[in-house]
């Protein structure tokens, strides 16, 4: 009789748990990003959303709005903060001075690759995101494969050659570097690069290789430095109130999809896409893809040293020790074998 009672009680418990799961309030999360649906990051976002749907037994649906449908690329952090969207893809480098800690990632000659480098970035930035992005719920961060500088009318070999050029910088730190070299910055999100180059508003742009082809930038550029100069960090954030409104089991699902492992999964196809673009552009007639010699590369590295000093000052203003932050980043990159 005791065994029967225990069996009945177990069955009732299972039934109640199943009923509770079935009655869990379904939620649809609006996810906005600014790259076109042909971009590999979009496909990775779709796979991420499908995994969330499956893990939540259908109680969380993720609806994705690509290509700046809901707002400009520069506005995506505020869109998540203000509840215009539930999840957004943020490029912190599009807002100079606002996120100085994560700006360490933008310093030249730091990252060797975008795959393990993304797992390292996410692992490192989790220790600081709560302070720097405190008005949103941090999910994960990653980076593209290293990018370089591309020019429309002038072959640039040495930093001194940048003087007088108009450059679309990929992020805030590179913008500071270009200013120190005597160039003028022209702000434009990635989908707008071709337009500013074609109209002569800019003479050069920072971009990873595959994105050149995706946005048609190779059609208006001719000279390309064949050296990995920089990366730009990308961050996914959630609206705080929306995350707080989720049930405990739904929060668990989201937490399991906001990890360094997922950062790598999202970054990997993008990294492959970007690195593959280099050989395609190099094979095109009329394109000059040229390496930097040892002395030339040393000159570029020397020219970037003041940029680090400016970054350090911005981190001090944010109340952090820049040496500790930078050493932490370097160590994490080394742990993931992804440092320059």
Regions found by a protein language model. Name each.
Residues 1-9:
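Bacterial N-terminal signal peptides that target proteins for export
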Residues 11, 23-116, 124, 131-340:
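N-terminal secretory/targeting leader peptides
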Residues 17-20:
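N-terminal signal peptide c-region/cleavage motif recognized by signal peptidases
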């Amino acid at each position: 009789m005791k065994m029967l009672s225990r069996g009945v009680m177990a069955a009732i418990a299972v039934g109640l748990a199943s009923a509770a799961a079935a009655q869990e309030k379904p939620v649809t999360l609006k996810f906005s990003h600014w790259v076109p649906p042909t971009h590999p990051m979009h496909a990775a976002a779709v796979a991420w959303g499908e995994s969330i749907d499956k893990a939540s037994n259908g109680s969380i649906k993720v609806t994705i709005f690509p290509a700046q449908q809901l707002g400009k690329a520069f506005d995506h952090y505020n869109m998540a903060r203000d509840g215009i969207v539930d999840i957004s893809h943020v490029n912190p480098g599009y807002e100079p001075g606002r996120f100085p800690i994560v700006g360490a990632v933008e310093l030249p000659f730091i990252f060797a690759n975008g795959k393990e480098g993304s797992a390292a970035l996410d692992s490192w930035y989790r220790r600081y995101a709560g302070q720097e992005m405190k008005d949103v719920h941090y999910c994960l961060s990653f980076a593209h494969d290293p990018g370089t500088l591309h020019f429309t009318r002038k072959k640039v070999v040495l930093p001194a050659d940048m003087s007088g050029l108009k450059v679309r910088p990929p992020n805030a730190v590179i913008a500071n570097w270009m200013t120190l070299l005597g160039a003028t910055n022209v702000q434009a999100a990635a989908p707008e690069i071709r337009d500013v180059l074609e109209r002569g508003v800019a003479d050069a742009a920072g971009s990873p290789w595959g994105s050149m082809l995706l946005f048609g930038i190779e059609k208006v550029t001719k000279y390309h430095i064949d050296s990995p100069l920089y990366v730009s960090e990308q961050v996914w954030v959630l609206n705080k109130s929306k995350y707080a409104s989720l049930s405990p089991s739904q929060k668990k699902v989201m937490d399991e999809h906001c990890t360094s492992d997922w950062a790598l999964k999202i970054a990997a196809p993008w990294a492959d896409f970007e690195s593959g673009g280099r050989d395609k552009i190099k094979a095109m007639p009329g394109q000059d893809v040229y390496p930097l010699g040892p002395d030339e590369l040393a000159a570029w590295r020397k020219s970037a040293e003041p940029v680090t000093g400016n970054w350090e000052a911005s981190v001090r203003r944010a109340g952090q020790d820049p040496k500790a932050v930078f050493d932490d980043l370097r160590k994490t990159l080394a742990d993931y074998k992804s440092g320059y």
